[in-house]
Amino acid sequence: LQRHQAGGERAASTHHGNTKKLLDAIVAAYEVDLIDAVKVPEKDLNRYDRIGFASGIYYSKFHQAVLNFAAVNMPQNKQTFFISTYGGKADYTSIEKALTAKNSVLLGKYGCKGYDTFGPFKLMGGLAKGHPDEADIAGAVAFYKEITEEK
């Protein structure tokens, strides 16, 4: 979440903490407010200029708590961005649908591989071991810098 010239995101990292690793790196570099959508299902976001939604991808969807949070709390006409980690592939359809009626302006999306042992992947030892790695994490910070710099 970005308060005027500050920064921010949203996370509900529940599997291996992959998405939280990206957000922790952004928090270390920028002034942001993190809100855990699992623990805080309702929050007034009107004071924020930019609102980011971050999640692991679960069966091609953002975490249900993040989707619910977005649908309930996202104000009209705000700038938004998405950050995700995934074992298979990035898919932003669910969060985009949750924000359809909010007239938000999408600033960008960042996604990277994340270690995944969800469901059948556990039997194979998981997907994307070692991710997010340092390059993935640096990419998330660079993405945040790019979308928040004044043009």
Model-identified regions with their sequence ranges:
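FMN-binding flavodoxin-like domain, especially the glycine-rich phosphate-binding loop
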Residues: 5, 14, 18-21, 25-35, ...
